[in-house]
Amino acid sequence: MTQDLQQYIHRFTHLRRAPQFGGAPHKPVLLLSIFQLFSKGLVTQNRIPVTAELVYFFKTIWKQLVTTQHLPVVNMPFFHLQSEGFWHLHAWYGKESELSHCRDIGSINKLNALVEYASLDEALYELLTQPITNAALERTLLDKYFATTEAQYCPDALTTVLDDIVIKPANIPQVPIAVAGAEKAVVEEDNFARGSLFKTVVPRIYDFTCSISKLRLTSTVQNVSMVDACHIVPFSESHDDSIGNGIALCPNLHRAFDKGLIAISDDYTVLVNKHIAEDKSSAFNLSQFAGQPLKLPYSENLFPTLENIGAHRKRWGY
């Protein structure tokens, strides 16, 4: 066993934790989540931002291991883990002073507004990139903090992010005004995870191609795509970030769809509003798409649902 590994095993078994309910599980669960990001190739450099995958892994591991009355919020351990000395927060440009004077983070939105990413001690980072030492540190946390529930730990379940977060219809309510504090933070984090994955996954399952115009443009130099993840029923009304409420559209057609200038029939062809006046000689006219079939994802269970496209038509009087 290397000296570095021994050092971090000692530090991981002596984490500073709030004593309530026998000790807060947040830091160990966050570390387990980070280990899985490494194992699954989702971290390839020593920069760990708050991502939808991290939030999802945290929530899933929490359900597997935690039996106390603590609430599963990521923002608290992500911020307070810096007290352990091996976790370092890096502020967005211009936010350095605000972060240095911050003593607590009340929500994931505030965390993302202040912190660009976290980094690990270089020695710890190197340990986590190696499967054997990664597994040894993982086992250390499980044995120390979750001895009675570690049999429920199933990291393979984390590969179902698309099914659990995006494909299945959302059942996440709008944050009620009366809900505050940690309970509100839980709902905000769930919404963050779904929303972030929606924006990432929808363009991907449409092969970064506009479903209506078939425009496809990507860049090998920059992370650029000319399609948006468009909600069919507005998120402000439905709070639905599932794939069945999404479609990939280029920006001009996204706007036209949101304004009801175009819609989708139950056979997945394009409808154009009969009450618009346009120059049909223009290469950008909407009428050219009338009756055209959509480009759809590779699997029918990823198609926009008939319920959602029907609600969109009804909204705009088709």
Task: List where the protein language model places each region.
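An acidic intrinsically disordered interaction segment
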Residues: 1-8, 216
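Short helix-coil boundary/hinge micro-motifs
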Residues: 5-169
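Active-site catalytic microenvironments for nucleophilic, acid-base chemistry
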Residues: 37-40, 216, 252
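Short, charged surface segments at domain edges that flank catalytic/cofactor-binding sites
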Residues: 140-141, 152-217, 233-244
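A detector for short metal-coordination/catalytic motifs
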Residues: 193-195, 218-318
